Amino acid sequence: MDSIWILSLLFFIIFLLLAAFKRKNHGKHRRIPSPPGFPIIGNLHQLGELQHQSLWKLSKKYGPVMLLKLGKVPTLILSSSETAKQALRDYDLHCCSRPSLAGGRELSYNNLDMSSSPYNEYWKELRKLCSQELFSANKIQSIQPIKDEEVKKVIDSIAESSSLKNPVNLSKTFLALTTSVVCKAAFGVSFEGSVLNSDRFNKLVRDTFEMLGSFSASDFIPYVGWIIDKFNGLQGWRKKSFRDLDAFYEQIFDLHKEEKEVGSEDLVDVLLRLEKEEIVVGNGKLTRNHIKAILMNILLGGIDTSAITMTWAMAELAKNPRVMKKVQAEIRNQIKNKERISFDDTDKLEYLKMVIKETWRLHPPTPLLLPRDVITEFEINGYTIPAKTRLHVNVWAIGRDPDTWKDPEMFLPERFNDSNIDAKGQNFELLSFGSGRRICPGLYMGTTMVEFGLANMLYHFDWKLPEGMVVEDIDMEEAPGLTVSKKSELVLVPVKYLDH
C-alpha cells in the first residue's frame, strides 16, 4: 500500500514538473499572431498601394506584434510605441542590420552607403566618418547662409505672386527649395546652375523614388523573383536609374576638379579630399564608388522628406485656421518687425515646433522605417523573434495609436504642450527619423530646414484658399511610394503681411 502511495506521489510530482516545463516552454515560443496566407506569395496579396495603411488595418485585428510571410520572407511588423522601444532600444544590437534589397543594392554600388549597408565594421567606420565630416553640428551651421539665400529667393518669388494675386503651388515650391539647399550644400552648384537647370534632374529624382518604392519580386521570392522583375520591366528600370545617377555624379565630380581650402568646401569637396588622403574605411580605401553611394543617400534622403513635411504642415494649417492664426501670431510677436528671420529666431518658436511634431505624428514622410534584419534571436512581448526575420516599424500606425494619443485623428499641436516628446529617437511615440544605431544622420539638418522654411512662409504671408474653395475641399489623400507625399498638389493664395 505504501509503495502505491509513493508511486502515485512520484507520478504527481512528475506531472507538475512536466506542466511547469510546458508552460515555460509555451511562454518562450508563443506563436506570433499572423494572418493566413497563400503558398508562395504568403501575405503579399494583403498589401495595398499604401502598405503602411494596409498593415495598420491588419494590426487592429492581429495586434502590435504581427508576423507576415511576404513571399518567402518572414516579416515582423511592430505597430506600437512600446514594441518599437523594445526592438529599437532594448534589442537594437540584435536587429540593426539591413536586408540586401535589389533597388538599394543597385544604386549603392552593392550596399556601400550608410542606409543599405549591413551592420559590420565597414558600416560603423563609414557612419563615424560621415558624422564627423558631413553631419556635424558645425558643418550643418556652416550651410545656414545657403538656407538664408535660397529661402530669400523663394520669399521674393512668392511676394511677386502675391502682388499679382496669383496662387502658389507649395508642393513644387518646397521641393524646389530643398533641392536648391541640398544641391548647393552638397555639390556646390545652385539648382539654377548648368548641370541642374533642367527638368531632367527633377525627373531623375522622381523616377528614382518611384523605382525604389515599386514592388520587387526578387526581394521576396528567391530564385525566380528576378525573372518577374525582368519581364515587368523593373530590372531594366533599376539599371537605367543607376546609369543616370552615375552620370550625374560624374558631372558633379567634373565641377570639383580644382581643390578648395578647408573651410570653404562643400560636401563633395570634403569626400574628394578624403579620397586623396587615402582614408581607410572597412577593409579598403575610400573610392569614387563609396563617394557616389554616400551622395545617393544625401540626394535621396535630403531632398524629399523635408519638402513633404512642409507641404503636409501647410495643408493641415489651411484645414485648421485656428492653428494657423495661433502659430502666425507666435512667429510675428517673437520676430517683431524684422525684415528677415534668422536661424537663431527659430529657437524661440515653441508653438511652431509643436505644429511640426504634430505634422510628423500624422504624416511621417517615411511611414514604415527602412527594414531591419534580425541578427540574433530576441524576445518582444513574450514572442521569440528568430534571426533572419525582416523587421518593420509602422511609424504611421504608432502616430494613430489611441492607447498613446487622445483623439489621434485630430490635428492638435497643443498635445505637445508641457511634453518632452521629440523626434530625436528617444521617444518612441514619435519616430520620424528612426532610433538606435540606424537613426537618420540627417536629423538635425532636416529639422532645421523645416523649422526655418515654415517660419519664413508663415511670417511673411497670410495664406488663403483659392477662390471657390472651402476647407472641406482640401484633399489629404496620400500618394504611394517609398516616402508618402500629399497625392494632390497643395495650392494656396499668398497675401503679403504688411506690418514689417
UniProtKB/Swiss-Prot annotation:
The keyword Heme applies. InterPro entries: Cyt_P450, Cyt_P450_CS, Cyt_P450_E_grp-I, Cyt_P450_sf. Gene3D superfamilies: Cytochrome P450. Its EC number is 1.14.-.-. Its cofactor is heme. The chain crosses the membrane at residues 1-21. PROSITE patterns: CYTOCHROME_P450. It is found in: Membrane. GO terms for molecular function: heme binding; iron ion binding; monooxygenase activity; oxidoreductase activity, acting on paired donors, with incorporation or reduction of molecular oxygen. It is a single-pass membrane protein. One of its GO terms (cellular component) is membrane. Belongs to the cytochrome P450 family. This is Cytochrome P450 71B26. It comes from Arabidopsis thaliana (Mouse-ear cress).
